[in-house]
């Protein structure tokens, strides 16, 4: 579905990505991990069109999207959430999600956009009493739900999730994990960046590890956790799937 071929990106003298080869297969939940500054968010930004690669290319459904702007990448079926929760603060939650419904993929346009926005807010678990509340009056957890609903409103084929569990309690994290599983069941392929290894290892079909902008490992969660290089530069110790 998605293929990055030799993708490199520099910011001044800093090589954020170094000839990264990377794939995401249809219907999988793929994980992208690595130390801070390893290039994870930069790679998501290249895929979503925020940054253009200095070399290499990004293919989506066998089409080169490397030079497309973010709104055109979105129109192809790739939508990204951000680490920092973003919204239109003076618009209601419903209006925020409507922006996604109205400006999503052309073939996915709805006959009743308001009802679609309501359904998505219900799907992500936002209280109906908050539908007509300005986004600036929501807490962080509620804003994350709205951001996710707005992303889903564009009818993505591939959803990029950048650290969606940041700032959540264990209970809220469990709810978010269940929601990610439900999204995949709806036929959406997912690529997620996350620092909570227990989540990545429990959710993902395949995991890719970046370090200093280079891919150092790729495989099943168990293969990645047992890779000596990954343990050395990132995990610190071998990850146990049976730890509480």
Give the ranges of each region predicted by the language model.
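Glycine-rich phosphate-binding loops of nucleotide-dependent enzymes
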Residues: 1-244
